[in-house]
From Swiss-Prot:
Any Pfam family the entry gives: PCRF
Residues where N5-methylglutamine is found: Q233
Organism: Oceanobacillus iheyensis (strain DSM 14371 / CIP 107618 / JCM 11309 / KCTC 3954 / HTE831)
Name listed for the protein in its UniProt record: Peptide chain release factor 1
InterPro entries with a match to the protein in the record: PCRF, Pep_chain_release_fac_I, Pep_chain_release_fac_I_sf, Prokaryotic/Mito_RF, RF-1
Length: 356
């Protein structure tokens, strides 16, 4: 492990030199590429440097113990050694995690697709609640949201809402939200006070760059139509809505959010590229999972991952068996407790696999 850490520090130092080179500074592509690589090494290199410093201090302290010390000095050095040993162990654990293979999509922006599933109007209302929950979480993180397409029910609910989240390491945190989310609550229209169960599905797709997914014009069928609002009424007499069909995969994307056909087509193309990329990723993951299961949960969109029980103010994540009695705060976007636990679970799984 130490040899690998040393080679990473050498690479980090080399990147520092390269980023000071006028030739690189004037080449925006190289500058971006090297800056991104350096940023990815920052945490592990800092941990390794501290580890070397702590190891040196520990060796010095052990040498001191070999000298003739009075009782007071002996106890001081002994306490320092215990403290340094503790810190060294912490850094070793931290570096093991930092050396785990990273998901290449972790630093990407995402498209989120939320759909009301079982439960009719109540499912659509819950889909709206989830959209607002993720919007608030994105706000807390300093991320930016752009709605691509929304099919609202007119009472704060959504049959479907597709939105993009731009920011730092978005996919690394939101990838765990893939799956079916179940809600248990008394609908406002329920006079008897009975608890109803409804479901909404969430899909999280990493943004795909053009170089990652080659989409040929000849493979895309483009249809245009007049956009419509809630209930199907026409809101635009021009043919501004766009439907793209990727013939080889059968993936269809319809966007009518903008008044401009060009803008709708641009948005649809981004979503289409992400869905095609996601399809390839899912197929590759399914093949990998036949031999070994590495992720938290299966990532299956139909897998029930979480239950939100409003009467009891609790949320349970079924993948890790974690229940939190703070539903009101979670619906305000306070998702860190769940996300941190899911990240830790995945890291533990990966460490166990390495040890096998």
């Amino acid at each position: 492990m130490l040899d690998r850490l040393q080679s990473l520090e050498d690479r980090y130092n080399k990147l520092n030199e390269m980023l000071s080179d006028p030739e690189v500074i004037n080449d925006s592509k190289k500058l971006r590429e090297y800056s991104k690589e350096q940023s990815g090494l920052e945490d592990v290199v800092q941990a390794y440097r501290e580890y070397k410093e702590v190891t040196e201090q520990l060796n010095d302290a052990k040498e001191m113990m070999e000298d003739k010390l009075d009782d007071e000095m002996y106890e001081m050095v002994k306490a320092e050694i215990a403290e340094l040993n503790g810190r060294k162990e912490e850094l070793e654990s931290s570096m093991k995690i930092l050396l785990l293979p990273k998901d290449p999509n972790d630093d990407k922006n995402v498209f989120m697709e939320i759909r009301g599933a079982a439960g009719g109007d109540e499912a659509a209302l819950f889909a709206g609640d989830l959209y607002r929950m993720y919007s608030r979480y994105a706000e807390h993180q300093g991320w930016k949201i752009d709605v691509m397409e929304a099919s609202s029910t007119g009472v704060g609910g959504y049959k479907e809402v597709i939105f993009m989240i731009n920011g730092s390491d978005v996919y690394s945190k939101l990838k765990y939200e893939n799956g079916a989310h179940r809600v248990q609550r008394v609908p406002e229209t329920e006079s008897g006070g009975r608890i109803h169960t409804s479901t909404a599905t969430v899909a999280v797709l990493p943004e795909a760059e053009e170089v990652e997914v080659e989409v040929h014009d000849k493979d895309i069928r483009v249809d245009t139509f007049a956009s419509s609002g809630p209930g199907g009424q026409s809101v635009n007499t021009t043919m501004s809505a766009v439907r793209l069909t990727h013939v080889p995969t059968g993936i269809v994307v319809s966007i009518q959010d903008e008044k401009s056909q060009i803008k709708n087509k641009e948005k649809a193309m981004k979503v289409l590229r992400a869905r095609i990329y996601d399809k390839f990723q899912q197929e590759a993951q399914a093949e990998y999972d036949e031999n070994r299961k590495s992720a938290v949960g299966s990532g299956d969109r139909s897998e029930r991952i979480r239950t939100y029980n409003f009467p009891q103010n609790r949320v349970t994540d079924h993948r890790i068996g974690l229940t939190i009695q703070k539903l009101d705060q979670i619906m305000q976007g306070k998702l860190d407790e769940f996300i941190d636990a899911l990240v830790m679970e995945e890291q533990t799984n990966k460490l166990e696999q390495i040890g096998e």
